[in-house]
């Protein structure tokens, strides 16, 4: 899959911007190609992502209106949900934020188990505003399972596995790719999870 064109993101992490719950936000910040305009999280408003992730100057704001008009920064065009609430469900408190983002013309990118495109209110608002909803958990129409096809000669595949989520499988794969490219080898990262797809899909 060819990477999408770079976007200008505001990342929603309300109440969860930290190493345990914001793996999507942190992964996109550390490895993504998109410009990140702001972190939308009222619990850390006024602070900066570089307190947690040195070298990443991204202000945290309390409201979407603030994120849309930060002096010296471009207007975002996409709201990306950067944390996974318990069960991967959409918190009711976020509904207004998402609807406001749609009305402001922002695309929505989500890895939640709740598919935003199947929510009647959110889907109708997006259709009326002419904006896209991208549910990264939505399975493609045709998904090929294991077919026993062998790899091409000379190709090496490194599979990273773990016994839990958010323990670094994707980060290891991305660091291996970075090291391989630095050594002059050809290497690609094939994402299978939502965060990886947001970074490289």
Model-identified regions with their sequence ranges:
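ATP-dependent carboxylate-amine ligase catalytic core
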Residues: 2-8, 22, 27-30, 41, ...
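Extreme N-terminal, non-catalytic leader segments
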Residues: 97-157
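Walker A (P-loop) phosphate-binding motif
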Residues: 145-189
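Glycine/threonine-rich flexible loop motifs
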Residues: 86-93
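Short internal beta-strands
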Residues: 35-43, 109-111
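Short, charged/polar "capping" segments at the starts of alpha-helices
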Residues: 19-20, 45-50, 115-119
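Redox-cofactor binding/interface segments in oxidoreductases and associated redox assembly factors
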Residues: 77-84, 110
């Amino acid at each position: 899959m060819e990477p999408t064109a770079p976007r200008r993101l505001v990342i929603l992490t309300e109440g969860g911007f930290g190493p345990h719950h914001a793996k999507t936000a942190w992964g996109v910040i550390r490895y993504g190609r998109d410009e990140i305009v702001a972190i939308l999280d009222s619990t850390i408003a006024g602070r900066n992502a570089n307190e947690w992730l040195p070298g990443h100057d991204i202000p945290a704001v309390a409201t979407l209106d603030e994120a849309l008009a930060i002096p010296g920064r471009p207007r975002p065009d996409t709201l990306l949900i950067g944390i996974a609430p318990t069960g991967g469900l959409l918190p009711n408190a976020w509904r207004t934020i998402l609807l406001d983002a749609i009305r402001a013309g922002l695309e929505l990118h989500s890895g939640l188990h709740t598919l935003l495109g199947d929510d009647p209110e959110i889907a109708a608002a997006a259709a009326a505003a002419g904006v896209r909803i991208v549910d990264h958990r939505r399975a493609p129409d045709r998904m090929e399972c294991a077919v026993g096809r062998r790899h091409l000669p000379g190709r090496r595949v490194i599979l990273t596995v773990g016994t839990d989520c958010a323990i670094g499988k994707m980060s290891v794969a991305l660091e291996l790719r970075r090291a391989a490219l630095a050594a002059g080898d050809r290497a690609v990262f094939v994402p299978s999870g939502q965060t990886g797809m947001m970074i490289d899909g």
